């Protein structure tokens, strides 16, 4: 029987150092693991002391290890910046760069309408936020909607997540360059 910490450790190492993984998920090619986290007994002990480590979401899924909620864009798995969060929170920060091309986050060009459309994922469903003449207009609508949604989800999980996660999410700002 594999321990949860063992799976987490192996997945973390694979994400940072596997060339095969990087071919499928190139954003991880610049990620690394702190020296302490490379030492399994240390990582195991650290996990067992963290808020959310033994928690489950409302579907019975274990909370996930996250490296970049506390510091946007963080590329290092380390004890200072990693936290355990429910999948719903982890999915809030997923960016779909390949699908949107050169447009701002949350914005796509609709060829048939000849307008920009703002869209946002909410609980795994796409919410259409309207058509706009400029990508900037569409982005502002997306930004306001997304920041409000992040706060809503943060409040839902407030009593079950690390206070640092709650504060980071409540202060999160969507940037046009995300």
Task: Kindly give the residue locations of the regions a language model identified.
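Short, structured coil/loop segments at alpha-helix boundaries
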Residues: 2-3, 21, 110, 157-166
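Short, cationic Gly/His-enriched loop motifs
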Residues: 2-3, 10, 15-17, 24-115, ...
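Short loop/turn hinge sites at secondary-structure boundaries
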Residues: 19, 23, 151-152
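A short, exposed loop/beta-hairpin motif centered on an aromatic-Gly-Thr core
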Residues: 31-35, 125-135
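An aromatic-rich alpha-helical recognition segment common to small helix-rich domains
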Residues: 43, 107, 118, 132, ...
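Generic "edge-of-domain/loop-turn" microfeature
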Residues: 89, 114, 125-127, 137
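Extended, polar beta-sheet/loop recognition surfaces of beta-rich domains
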Residues: 89, 149-178
């Amino acid at each position: 029987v594999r321990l949860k910490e063992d799976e987490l450790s192996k997945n973390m190492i694979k994400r940072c150092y596997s060339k095969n993984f990087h071919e499928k998920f190139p954003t991880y090619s610049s990620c690394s693991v702190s020296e302490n986290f490379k030492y399994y007994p240390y990582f195991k002990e650290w996990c067992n002391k963290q808020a959310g480590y033994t928690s489950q979401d409302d579907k019975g899924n274990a909370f996930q290890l996250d490296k970049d909620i506390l510091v946007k864009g963080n590329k290092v798995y380390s004890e200072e910046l990693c936290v355990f969060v429910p999948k719903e929170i982890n999915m809030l920060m997923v960016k779909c760069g390949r699908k949107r091309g050169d447009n701002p986050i949350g914005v796509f060009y609709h060829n048939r309408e000849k307008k920009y459309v703002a869209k946002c994922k909410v609980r795994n469903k796409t919410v259409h936020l309207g058509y706009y003449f400029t990508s900037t207009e569409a982005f502002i609508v997306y930004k306001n909607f997304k920041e409000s949604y992040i706060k809503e989800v943060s409040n839902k999980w407030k009593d079950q997540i690390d206070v640092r996660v709650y504060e980071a999410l409540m202060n999160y700002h969507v940037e046009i360059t995300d």
